[in-house]
Amino acid sequence: MTAKTLLGKAAAGVRTSRITRAVPADDGRRKGAHLLKVRDVALFADIIGQGYPLLLMHGGPSLDHWSLTPFRELADQFTVVFYDHRCNGRSVGAPVSSMTFENLTADAEALREELGFERWAVLGHSFGGHVALEYALRYPASLSHLVLLDTGGEARWSQQNAPELLARRGYSPRMVELIRRWFNGEFAPHEYVPMAMRILMAGVYSYNPSLWQIAREELQGGWHTKFRPQAFIFAGRHLLKGWSVMDRLAEITAPTLVMAGSSDFVFPPECQRELAAGTPHARLQLIDRAGHDPHSEQTAEVMAAVRHFLSAETPAA
């Protein structure tokens, strides 16, 4: 969950190639914001730019692609594919009970096929990072690069550790309990916005929260967000209960960038080190003076890191 949207190593012996090769021809049908029918859903997608394809998986759940608005600047170098997960944002056609990792990843794979890309890079933020990890494990042949932004390989970091970390940081017992309920989906849909506002105004997601920072992030696109509280509740109560891929990280074959704000309370540095250590071809980069949304707080540094990573030599299919 982002502050913005709450409010409004290569493998040895493997041939390498530049990421700029084998870019599909643009047919005009892909570009712009529209609904794309794939499988049993219509996914809202916004495709911009030209170059090697980069799929962005947003967090939440309950949010949409607007939470990743700062990444629009990468369109000068890449074809950037924003989309809303099923049951999130402006995507339509499926009940919230269908929001499983099997369906979420199959949707992304069907989207790749619909857009005509052989492979692509995938960036997942927060919950989107969970989906990206599952995608890397289920569809390795479709993935050239993996960027994991402020995420973890198991749900205990948000559902159990995050409240405990806030308590150690001196937050009130009421706020700690609110965060515990929040990440475990222990609330009704009508409570979503009031709870989100309390959490946002407490500044837990940001390194240096201020009204100016909130206003600046809203101007970047957060006010466009369409909230879907039921998705967040379903994830907390069902989808993420006991979820972990930590015992399967060694299966990930794609070069991986693990990146996060050094002050993130949801997926703190120890989580990032654990994630990077378990992933064979991963590099770790912590962003100073940033919390859960470093792409909003330290935009230039994050964009430079992603550009550098995606432009490096990479294993070929």
Where in the sequence are the language-model features?
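Conserved alpha/beta-hydrolase "acid-adjacent" motif
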Residues: F265-C271
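Short beta-strand/loop motif that positions the catalytic acidic residue
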Residues: I252, V258-A260
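Flexible "cap/lid" loop of the alpha/beta hydrolase fold
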Residues: L146-G185
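Alpha/beta-hydrolase
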Residues: E177-D247, A254
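Conserved HGGG/HGGXW glycine-rich cap/lid loop of the alpha/beta-hydrolase fold
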Residues: V41-G93
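Conserved hydrolase catalytic core segment
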Residues: E118-A162
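Catalytic active-site module of serine/aspartate enzymes centered on a nucleophile-bearing elbow/loop
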Residues: A282-A317
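Active-site loop/oxyanion-hole signature of alpha/beta-hydrolase fold enzymes
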Residues: F82, C87-F127, A304
